[in-house]
Amino acid sequence: MAFDKDAIIASLKDATILDLADLVSAIEEEFNVSAAAPVAAAGGADGAAAAKTDFDVELTSAGTAKVKVIKAVREATGLGLKEAKDLVDNAPSIVKEGLDEAAANDLKAALEETGASVTLK
């Protein structure tokens, strides 16, 4: 049987919507396929566009008032004096991880008041 694409297209142009719906159903049944559009999986660029919910507070620089920054880090994290000093001395370093946006912004503001440079990741 010869396949005449132009004849098929001409036949489809003359068909009614009901005839075309029946044709689609018959093709789906005959070839065990679905005419439904595939649903794209979430992720990739769409995932990056989603609102971020967890933030890490990174101390990028202690500034000139290192003692005040160490005190603020101790208050925020509950670390001991040595651990807080090491964290500040080894900047850039993560002060706290997995905070919600409000808590991360509060901690950032508290550290910046002491003269530290802070970024949210």
Curated annotation (Swiss-Prot):
It comes from the Bacteria. Homodimer. Part of the ribosomal stalk of the 50S ribosomal subunit. Forms a multimeric L10(L12)X complex, where L10 forms an elongated spine to which 2 to 4 L12 dimers bind in a sequential fashion. Binds GTP-bound translation factors. GO terms for molecular function: mRNA binding; structural constituent of ribosome. InterPro entries: Ribosomal_bL12 (IPR000206), Ribosomal_bL12_C (IPR013823), Ribosomal_bL12_C/ClpS-like (IPR014719), Ribosomal_bL12_oligo (IPR008932), Ribosomal_bL12_oligo_N_sf (IPR036235). Coiled coil: none annotated. The keyword Ribosomal protein applies. Disulfide bonds: none annotated. Pfam families: Ribosomal_L12, Ribosomal_L12_N. HAMAP family: Ribosomal_bL12 (MF_00368). Belongs to the bacterial ribosomal protein bL12 family. CDD domains: Ribosomal_L7_L12. Keywords: Ribonucleoprotein, Ribosomal protein. This is Large ribosomal subunit protein bL12. Forms part of the ribosomal stalk which helps the ribosome interact with GTP-bound translation factors. Is thus essential for accurate translation. GO terms for cellular component: cytosolic large ribosomal subunit. One of its GO terms (biological process) is translation.
